[in-house]
Structures are given as C-alpha cells and as structure tokens.
Amino acid sequence: MRCVVYSIAKSSPLELVKIYQKQCRQFDCELELVDLFPKNTANAQKISKEFAQKSYSLAFEPYLNPKAKNIALHPKAQRGDSFAFSKMLENHLNINFFIAGAYGFEENFLKGCQAWSLSEMTFSHEVAKIVLCEQIYRALSIIFKHPYHK
C-alpha cells in the first residue's frame, strides 16, 4: 500500500510524522509527504481566493490518479470516527490525500476526489499532517487488528 499526502505548503520536516511513517511500514504501507508551493501560488494568494484555489488545483492535478483513491481534506465534508476512516481506506493499494492552502479547494477539484473532514476546526498544515498521519496509522491498525487502536 502507498499513501501520499500532498499539501500546499513550504517544506517542513516533522519529527512526529517520521515516527508514523516508520510505524506504517510494519503494515507494508509506504507513507509519503509531498509539499508543493509553486511560484505562482504566492502571487495568486495575493490576488484573490479564486486565483489561489485555481493555483492549488493546478499544483495538485498532476497527482490525481484515476487508479488511486483520491481524498481531499475539506472542513465541510463527510467526517466520521477512526473506524469509518479505516473502512474508507480498506482495499485500496494507492491512496492520495490532498491538503489545500488557506483558501481551500475549487469545486471542480473536489469533484475528482472523495472529500473527508478531520474536524470542523481549522488546523495549521503541520497539525493537519500530524493528525492525518496518525489516523492513517490508526486505520491500518484497525484493518490489521493491531492493538494500537484500542
């Protein structure tokens, strides 16, 4: 299994994420983080919400894979507990997660993904990545009946 978390962010190594990456390997899952921040994104964010959202879509579109499960994190999307999250991931070998910048996703981009919400609360990219990586590890623990999830 391969899970890739794509985010509109400048690179920021997170020690806790590295721990979850290592733990996911025991379930034969490669957890990878890819930070994208094209030059046009900074300018687009200064112009308008619409320009910013378009720049996020353009950055993410090459990574949308029709053979993978594509999941966009969106505060107004479906949410559930860790068991529901694990069901969503189960039986998929390639899973792509997308975390937009401050202005969120364009509606057109969301149509190509399943949307999921970690919370109604707003998180920094760093916190969202840590929560997501922990939940991926927890989902794998549930799927493989590992005692971590209890």
From Swiss-Prot:
It is found in: Cytoplasm. Keywords: Cytoplasm, Methyltransferase, rRNA processing, S-adenosyl-L-methionine, Transferase. One of its GO terms (molecular function) is rRNA (pseudouridine-N3-)-methyltransferase activity. SUPFAM superfamilies: alpha/beta knot (SSF75217). Its main location: cytoplasm. Its EC number is 2.1.1.177. Pfam families: SPOUT_MTase. S-adenosyl-L-methionine binds at residues 100, 118-123. GO terms for cellular component: cytoplasm. It comes from the Bacteria. InterPro entries: Alpha/beta_knot_MTases, RlmH-like, tRNA_m1G_MTases_N. The keyword tRNA-binding does not apply. The keyword Cell membrane does not apply. It catalyses: pseudouridine(1915) in 23S rRNA + S-adenosyl-L-methionine = N(3)-methylpseudouridine(1915) in 23S rRNA + S-adenosyl-L-homocysteine + H(+). Homodimer. Belongs to the RNA methyltransferase RlmH family. Specifically methylates the pseudouridine at position 1915 (m3Psi1915) in 23S rRNA. This is Ribosomal RNA large subunit methyltransferase H. It comes from Helicobacter pylori (strain HPAG1).
